[in-house]
């Protein structure tokens, strides 16, 4: 007896799936380049926590283990005063910027920042145990300091970067949850904002949710969320706006090995050990991280980088005239100690009560860019593709797509504000909404910082040397040669002398 196959038959989708194409297919690059640079960018604050007075932050938290996310605002090239107006037709083309080079400058000396907690949950030294400690008291917290994992990172894209961390998830229905049970974990992907903490060696997690004792990690992260860049998610972005390229260097080693005080939530199975005469000690082990040596030989910053081909489909085009540069540099994380006298008349002998100690961390940045002017021909196919990718781009260009025809008959009243008719739907707000409203970034405005004189800037001179592009307005300085009274050429005169 014949029977049909048990394999499933997969039917193709009714409409063809649109293919994502690279920006090089519809963006034409010109030979016009501009240099733009920021001013000296400085940040000063307390490295562990913000200082508040009357519920108002008077000293911000500034740590060497924070993300610095720069939102670079560029001028609209379609409203730009160009040296050559014949490069594009405003009726059928639009101009965009392409980032072709950048240099992230870092000031301040190399240094290692120390963090810690005066009440850290450290019970016993399990690396070099002098005795077997099995009965911890009610409070065994001690004062411990450490250095963190070493990280250097630079992410570049035209959209904010994404980060990942572990947070508390939701329990399934029907599960009996008791107080003290381990909560379920959930991988959360979110936008990395300026001031978010990086992974310090204790994991990318929400410590406020998953460590309720506030004593398992140092002060600067015990109530914070440490994020790690979500490279997999950004690499899978179909349009490649979040990540043109990235530079990364991480290193860490385990310096000390401790265990935690407290009740063990999950006991060791009896088949894994032979019972002894002593009570089993705590088996919740952890290590203190260390980033080891910092050296100028392994620096990612203070050097130029040229973008020839991005890893995604967006080859450096700055949609919306925005560029996001995300920086992490823990090799300059020195925490400075500031001492202030509490009285104007100090005693001859030292008294610690006459002085107040403060902690401060400072950061210094300088951003330099090379931008290339590009044109886009506004064909129907290109405009439809851009509208599918990001409709706000066409809105910024004062374009709109007509809606599809509606087969239903709509009602329109003469007197909209009349009480004799039903309440009408509110008119939608036509003001342009900031797509990044509610997110915190360090904004760098470069609208008035563009210059075509590349040879007048350090990064511009490096770009001219690397690419061989001539400056747009070279100045040739030469010495005028005096007119010769002889009619013979130099070659003729040399031959005449040899005879």
Curated annotation (Swiss-Prot):
Region (Disordered): 472-499
Cell compartment(s), UniProt: Virion; Host nucleus
GO MF annotations in UniProt: structural molecule activity
Signal sequence residues: none
Purpose of the protein: Forms an icosahedral capsid with a T=7 symmetry and a 50 nm diameter. The capsid is composed of 72 pentamers linked to each other by disulfide bonds and associated with L2 proteins. Binds to heparan sulfate proteoglycans on cell surface of basal layer keratinocytes to provide initial virion attachment. This binding mediates a conformational change in the virus capsid that facilitates efficient infection. The virion enters the host cell via endocytosis. During virus trafficking, L1 protein dissociates from the viral DNA and the genomic DNA is released to the host nucleus.
Subunit structure: Self-assembles into homopentamers. The capsid has an icosahedral symmetry and consists of 72 capsomers, with each capsomer being a pentamer of L1. Interacts with the minor capsid protein L2; this interaction is necessary for viral genome encapsidation. Interacts with protein E2; this interaction enhances E2-dependent replication and transcription activation.
InterPro entries for this protein: Capsid_L1_Papillomavir, Capsid_L1_sf_Papillomavir, dsDNA_vir_gr_I_capsid
Gene Ontology cellular component list: host cell nucleus; T=7 icosahedral viral capsid
Keyword hit for Plastid: no
Native organism: Human papillomavirus 13
Gene from which this protein is expressed: L1
HAMAP family: PPV_L1 (MF_04002)
Family note: Belongs to the papillomaviridae L1 protein family.
Name under which the protein is recorded: Major capsid protein L1
GO BP, one annotated term: endocytosis involved in viral entry into host cell
Native organism taxonomy: Viruses, Monodnaviria, Shotokuvirae, Cossaviricota, Papovaviricetes
Superkingdom of source: Viruses
UniProt KW keywords: Capsid protein, Disulfide bond, Host nucleus, Host-virus interaction, Late protein, T=7 icosahedral capsid protein, Viral attachment to host cell, Viral penetration into host cytoplasm, Virion, Virus endocytosis by host, Virus entry into host cell
Gene3D superfamilies in the cross-refs: Major capsid L1 (late) superfamily, Papillomavirus
TM stretches of this protein: none
Pfam families (UniProt xref): Late_protein_L1
């Amino acid at each position: 007896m014949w029977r049909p196959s048990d394999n499933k038959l997969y039917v193709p989708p009714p409409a063809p799936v649109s293919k994502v194409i690279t920006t090089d297919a519809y963006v034409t690059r010109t030979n016009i380049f501009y240099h733009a640079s920021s001013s000296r960018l400085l940040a000063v604050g307390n490295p562990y926590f913000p200082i508040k007075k009357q519920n108002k932050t008077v000293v911000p938290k500034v740590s060497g283990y924070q993300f610095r996310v720069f939102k670079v605002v560029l001028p609209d090239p379609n409203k730009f005063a160009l040296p050559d107006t014949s490069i594009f037709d405003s009726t059928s083309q639009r101009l965009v910027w392409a980032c072709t080079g950048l240099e992230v400058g870092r000031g301040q000396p190399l240094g290692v920042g120390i963090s810690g907690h005066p009440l850290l949950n450290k019970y016993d030294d399990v690396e070099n145990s002098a005795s077997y400690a099995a009965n911890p008291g009610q409070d065994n917290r001690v004062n411990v300091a450490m250095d963190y994992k070493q990280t250097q990172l630079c992410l570049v894209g035209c959209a904010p970067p994404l980060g990942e961390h572990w947070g508390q998830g939701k329990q399934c229905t029907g599960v009996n949850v008791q107080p003290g049970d381990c909560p379920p974990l959930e991988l959360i992907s979110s936008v990395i904002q300026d001031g978010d903490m990086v992974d310090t060696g204790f994991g990318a997690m929400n410590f406020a949710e998953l460590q309720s004792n506030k004593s398992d990690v140092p002060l600067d992260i015990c109530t914070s969320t440490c994020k790690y860049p979500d490279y997999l998610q950004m690499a899978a972005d179909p349009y490649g706006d979040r990540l043109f390229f990235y530079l990364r260097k991480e290193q860490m080693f385990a310096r000390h090995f401790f265990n935690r005080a407290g009740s063990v939530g999950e006991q060791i199975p009896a088949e894994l050990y032979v019972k002894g005469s002593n009570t089993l000690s705590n088996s919740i082990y952890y290590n203190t991280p260390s980033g080891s040596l910092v050296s100028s030989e392994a620096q990612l910053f203070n050097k130029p980088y040229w973008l020839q081909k991005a890893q995604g489909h967006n080859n450096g085009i700055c949609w919306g005239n925005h560029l996001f540069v995300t920086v992490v540099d823990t090799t300059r994380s020195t925490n400075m100690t500031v001492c202030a006298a509490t009285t104007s008349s100090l005693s001859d002998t030292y008294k610690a009560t006459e002085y107040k100690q403060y902690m401060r961390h400072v950061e210094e940045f300088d951003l330099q860019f090379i931008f290339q002017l590009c044109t886009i021909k506004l064909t129907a196919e290109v405009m439809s593709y851009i509208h599918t990718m990001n409709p706000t781009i066409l809105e910024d260009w004062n374009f709109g797509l007509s809606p599809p025809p509606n087969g239903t008959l709509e009602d329109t009243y003469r007197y909209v504000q009349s009480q004799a008719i039903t309440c009408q739907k509110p008119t939608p707000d036509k003001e342009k909404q900031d797509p990044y409203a509610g997110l915190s970034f360090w904004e760098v405005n470069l609208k008035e910082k563009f210059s075509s004189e590349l040879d007048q800037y350090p990064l511009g001179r490096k770009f001219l040397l690397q690419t061989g592009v001539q400056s747009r307005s070279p100045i040739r300085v030469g010495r005028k040669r005096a007119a010769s009274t002889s009619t013979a050429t130099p070659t003729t005169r040399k031959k005449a002398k040899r005879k």
